[in-house]
């Protein structure tokens, strides 16, 4: 089976620090290659893969301001689709622009919808349902107006996240610094529980960062560390009493949630979006509806078995399970 894996070009694949879509694309690509699938990864030219790397984009546009996102996204797409007939299947991880090319080629295409942002994007999904096989990353993120080939939860390489059986007394926030992700709520919950909070993530909303994070960050009770990747990411996720994920939107998935649990860290999350699909209340974390409930949950974290947190990820959110699910979908589409 020859698969063209179309990665986004906002960040390198795999990302150096931040880049959840690129991370999932890389994890799936490498797992498929390990299973003997002939995968060509179409990504930025600084990307890395055990498969075949192909591309025309010199660098990620979020890292290099000289790269015009719109120009190079379409150049990226054109480069792949010009050679579509070389492949049995195209797997699009790069959002809806690729759909404009789908009707122009005979090669079947899978699109992983990494988050259905609003009804405004439906015009780039509904007309292509007979040509593109859509995959949701959670049942919560399925849109009622679309047909889906499957729901496939993300998976991670659990061995990349060392188990910490103890953690610490401190709390953790891990995500974009943006109102959606609830940094302000995490700060409020940490203060109310009188525990230190460590925040990690890229600043996506500068005004919000200046209003909510900067005044609170005294490097004693609240510390902002910026974005981290690799071993530093795993170390941060494991060395906490709990991850506070008090989101203000219906998040389609949450990689940091399952990464934290893989390290043994329980997650206290808002009971919305995909969180009830990831968190089993009282087993690997707690689902809450307010900051007050989060504060109460912080005091109950001792009831959670950190080994059970890791086991829940091993059973449900491994990269092997994700790769097997996608491979089964590919075979079903191709009639193999």
Question: What are the residue ranges of the model-derived segments?
Answer:
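Catalytic cores of nucleotide-sugar-dependent glycosyltransferases that transfer UDP/GDP/TDP-activated
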Residues: 1-336
